[in-house]
Structures are given as structure tokens and as C-alpha cells.
Amino acid sequence: MNHRPKKRFGQNFLQDRQVVDGIFAAADLQPEDRVLEIGPGLGALTDRLLPEVARLHVIEIDRDLGAGLQARDEDKLVVHLGDALKLDWTALLTDPPYKLIANLPYNISSQIVFKILDHRHLFSRLVLMFQQEVGERLCAGPGSKNYGILSVLCQVWFDIRRVLRVPPGAFYPPPKVHSAVLCFDALAQPRIVVEDQQFFRRVVKAAFAQRRKTLRNSLTGAGLGFDGLEVSLLDAGIDPGRRAETLSLEEFGKLAQLIQPHFV
């Protein structure tokens, strides 16, 4: 298929067979598996996945590419035309669990991750391509310069590991950055107790909003300060003068629990 990549959709089509095979291997697909692919593009991954699974849903925003996918005479293939950020995944994926496999458009990859977190009950495993820098952030631990919002939020719910490094030449057109494929395995139980996911996310975002500031200043600046904040932090064993990047998942859990009663 002759198709000119569209910059507005962040299209960099995967064309390296070894990378496709590596993604396929990481997915560990079984004949009964149901899979969601976001951004199938020219179909390099789609062609590899389709013969091996019970059902393959694909979400494609480019109607030209979507028409080509819809023209395939494949009962197992379900094509959803539209923006993955706007479509209702719960309505589309009615018989979970699914495996999510995608070469994500880099301009929306972080937004897609937040949507995945909101729909994590739908998925047992994710195998996702990211810009290398984003991949490093997702895998980073406390004390690392790459440790941040995505690290904390994803590691609460998933085991994450890098399975492939991918050079620009694996794509057409080649991006200006290197890429990484990560595998996320859903945990049976989160690593910490999260009573209110949205409030927990709010606290984590506030703590990292200004990385060079202390927790005391970051939380207050984000509207999460209250009388007695410092005492509450100290009682929880958290120095108010620390920075967010030094906190463990457990400490973020404590932080959310001690702040939330003041904002109910």
C-alpha cells in the first residue's frame, strides 16, 4: 500500500521484521487470547498477530489506513476508526482480559498510558513501543533523575521490563530518537493500597510538579497544603524537606493517605 506518512498523526511505521518478532515473542500469545492494537498503520504487527489470536481489535485514527484494514476479509479482525484517546475502551472491549500491543505514536504516548491506567482492569499484559526517554522514565526507581509521575503510577499496578532497544532505522520514516519496547504485566494486587486512584494521581503529580522544590513547597504550591502538613509528614516518617524523586511507592501511598482526609 502506498501511503504518505502524516505528521499530524505522528506516523512512523514499523518495518523491521526482527523487531516485530521481538514484540510478538514478548506478548506470549495463546490461541485463546484477545488483543487490542493501537495504531496498526501499515499492518506489520497486525499481520503477525492476526493468525495467532482469537480476536484482534485495532484502533486506527487515519481513515485511509482504516479503510485498508476494513477491506480485509478476516472474521477475527475488528477495526475501530477513531482517536484512541477519545474512544470508549470499555464499550469496545466487552470480554476482557485483553493484551494490548502497540507501536504508540510518540506525541500521545504519555496520554495513552494515563488512559491505560484508567482502564487497567481490561488488560493482563501490555507490550508497548515508546521513545527511549519515556521508556527509561517508566522503568526508573527512586533516586533516579528519570523517576517521575509515570514511574510511580505505573509501577503501582504493573511489573515493567524493557525487552528491546529499537534504532530509528526500524521505522519509515525514521524518527530522530531511539525507541524501546516495554512489557507490562498486570499485578494481581497493587504494590501499595490506593484507596482513591484519582486523588493518588493528584498527589503524585503535585509532588513532581516542580522537581527541584521540596515536598513541603510542591504540595502547598499545588493546593494540597494544610495546617499541620509538616507535622503529618514527620509523623509518617517523611521529611518535608525531601524531594519527590526520593520517595518510594510506599511513601507515596502514605503521603496520599495522610493528605486525603483534609480534602474530602
Swiss-Prot record:
Reactions accelerated catalytically: adenosine(1518)/adenosine(1519) in 16S rRNA + 4 S-adenosyl-L-methionine = N(6)-dimethyladenosine(1518)/N(6)-dimethyladenosine(1519) in 16S rRNA + 4 S-adenosyl-L-homocysteine + 4 H(+)
Annotated protein name in UniProt: Ribosomal RNA small subunit methyltransferase A
Swiss-Prot/TrEMBL keywords: Cytoplasm, Methyltransferase, RNA-binding, rRNA processing, S-adenosyl-L-methionine, Transferase
InterPro entries found in the cross-reference section: KsgA/Erm, rRNA_Ade_diMease-like_C, rRNA_Ade_Mease_Trfase_CS, rRNA_Ade_methylase_Trfase_N, rRNA_adenine_dimethylase, SAM-dependent_MTases_sf
Record-linked PANTHER family: DIMETHYLADENOSINE TRANSFERASE (PTHR11727), DIMETHYLADENOSINE TRANSFERASE-RELATED (PTHR11727:SF7)
Compartments in which it is found: Cytoplasm
Function text: Specifically dimethylates two adjacent adenosines (A1518 and A1519) in the loop of a conserved hairpin near the 3'-end of 16S rRNA in the 30S particle. May play a critical role in biogenesis of 30S subunits.
Residues that, per the record, bind S-adenosyl-L-methionine: N12, L14, G39, E60, D83, N103
Main location: cytoplasm
Organism annotation: Syntrophotalea carbinolica (strain DSM 2380 / NBRC 103641 / GraBd1)
GO molecular function: 16S rRNA (adenine(1518)-N(6)/adenine(1519)-N(6))-dimethyltransferase activity; RNA binding
EC code: 2.1.1.182
Record flagged with keyword Cytoplasm: yes
Entry GO terms, CC: cytosol
Protein family per UniProt: Belongs to the class I-like SAM-binding methyltransferase superfamily. rRNA adenine N(6)-methyltransferase family. RsmA subfamily.
